[in-house]
Amino acid sequence: ATDGDADRIGVIDDKGNFLHPNDILVLLYYYLVKFKGWHGPVVRNIATTHMLDKVAEQFGEKCYEVPVGFKYVSAKMQETGAIIGGESSGGLTVHGHINGKDGIYAAALLIEMLAVTGKKLSQIMDDIHAECGEIHMEERDYKFTLEKKLKMQEVLMEQKQLPDLPEEIDHVSYLDGSKVYFKNGGWVIARFSGTEPLLRIFCEMPDAVEAADICTRYE
């Protein structure tokens, strides 16, 4: 199914589970490289799964990170020659197609992938995890008033405060929100939505329980 303007898709897999847009991106990048023989990097925004990094590394490619906003994805794709780029909110495009998001094209490419591989979506995801490893994402949204937003901005972006986190920190980026990169490969980002009065927390860790725990620490 697509959204109203058909620039994003929603997918239910063969087991009846909703396929997260992160997984759609991972599946299509894996398909383009492994089965279609394409070569090139991938582009994702700062809040999108690092499974793309793992798949890229597996095939000797690179993953580029950009701020949230599809214009940044498109620009980086043109700059680097990336073969696919997208965001965890559901938009993606492929090299040689349009520079904007296209849900119908993405759906057609998924169907092509199923036909070419002869496998179900869940089976291909299992193959990816077996080859590239697995990480778990937790997402939280928090509503706020304008007064609360100003206070949170001060704490996160000006004072650069962080909660007590259980993993050793590699570095912190303020490219778009406050993103902590852990030495174990995990990460967590706190950023304000550009379209809704929400503070969004995304965390991805090797362990699902720890990802949920880290999100809770931001409360």
Model-derived regions, located:
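Phosphate-binding and adjacent anionic-ligand microenvironments
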Residues: W38-E219
